[in-house]
Amino acid sequence: MGYNIPRGTQDILPGESDRWQFVEQIMRDTCRTYQYKEIRTPIFEHTELFARGVGESTDIVQKEMYTFEDRKGRSLTLRPEGTAAAVRAFNENKLFANPVQPTKLYYVGPMFRYERPQTGRYRQFYQFGIEAIGSKDPAIDAEVMALAMSIYEKAGLENVKLVINSLGDQDSRKSYREALVKHFEPRIEEFCSDCQSRLHTNPLRILDCKKDRDHELMKSAPSILTYLNEESAAYFEKVKQYLNDLGISYEIDPNLVRGLDYYNHTAFEIMSNAEGFGAITTLAGGGRYDGLVEQIGGPEAPGIGFAMSIERLLAAIDAEKRELPVDKGIDCYIVTLGEKAKDYSVSLVYKLREAGISSEIDYENKKMKGQFKTADRLKARFIAILGEDELAQNKINVKDAQTGEQIEVALDEFIHVMKANQKG
């Protein structure tokens, strides 16, 4: 019997994986210039980490986690997001003791949520994320957003926008929660069951509801910005000032709260405006999470970060009809004629590869015409032709597939010639 992949997952096949590697390299190169270092955490963690870190009342914890028991009855969960695990690693490995702070981390890898699969949303999905832990400076907030926007710019995207908000400190949110309850309570029965249950547990999450987003009460909800105390308002003003100084355009959305419980002060999303991108326009999202480090067992250490969907980045590139510079083809394909030439080509192609020259030979015993077709399909820049006559004369014919020019080269000079003409 045949097998299919589980619903909500995908195979990333050769060709497409080149595009993934290209954008991932943009992410890694950008992190290097901003001095963020890679961290690799386990794909599964103790369930309690996400319950405490992400929030008991969130959709992620309530409905979407892949949780299982190991053979000793311990509850483990496939990671649904990256921040909680990064903070756990920060605490457990005492990264807070490093003399240079903040600790700047990035990660790339699969996450898992049991959601309804749709375009741009999978049950196994890939995220790139960064965390800056150990500083409560508005400048680091601006840096984090600048880094994200820089990645989209380097990927060639033009139709993106940064949307920001402030959730304020604990006192500001307390005042705002009271105002939200007062606003929603008279007609809360008109909302979905999830929003009704959140009214007195976490009313800010009502603003993040996808089902009721267009409800008139949602549109007329009070703005959190009017409930910021002096300190929180000043912090937000400083963040905006730095973004202005960096020349980064942004919009303010007072209903932007994000879907995780640990956010405070700065919250932001980056969205695609590309025509035909689809219903899910959010490319990345993040914010400040002061208090999370202490909440999961560490010292006082404020932090900020974001997560970026790699699938949605590639979808946005397609929506804007951008071509990534991948699939350049190989440097050289060796066409052989005769058994002795084939035997010699096995060691010759090995030497080419060891010299850093991408190259290939025939493994299907094709005739010469078939080998030339394979070279064409592989987009070989040079086609080296080796028969038994050439081998006896210690020579090889080299054809430039772009110009059609063909030259004869001594075998002991062949690798040097290929190296000199290698693709950039």
Swiss-Prot record:
Keywords: Aminoacyl-tRNA synthetase, ATP-binding, Cytoplasm, Ligase, Nucleotide-binding, Protein biosynthesis. PROSITE patterns: AA_TRNA_LIGASE_II (PS50862). Its EC number is 6.1.1.21. It comes from the Bacteria. It is found in: Cytoplasm. It catalyses: tRNA(His) + L-histidine + ATP = L-histidyl-tRNA(His) + AMP + diphosphate + H(+). GO terms for cellular component: cytoplasm. GO terms for biological process: histidyl-tRNA aminoacylation. InterPro entries: aa-tRNA-synth_II, aa-tRNA-synth_II/BPL/LPL, Anticodon-bd, Anticodon-bd_dom_sf, His-tRNA-ligase, HisRS-like_core, HisRS/HisZ, HisRS_anticodon. One of its GO terms (molecular function) is histidine-tRNA ligase activity. It is an enzyme of class 6 (ligase). HAMAP family: His_tRNA_synth. Homodimer. PANTHER family: HISTIDINE--TRNA LIGASE, MITOCHONDRIAL-RELATED (PTHR43707:SF1), HISTIDYL-TRNA SYNTHETASE (PTHR43707). Belongs to the class-II aminoacyl-tRNA synthetase family. This is Histidine--tRNA ligase. It comes from Bacillus subtilis (strain 168). The gene is hisS.
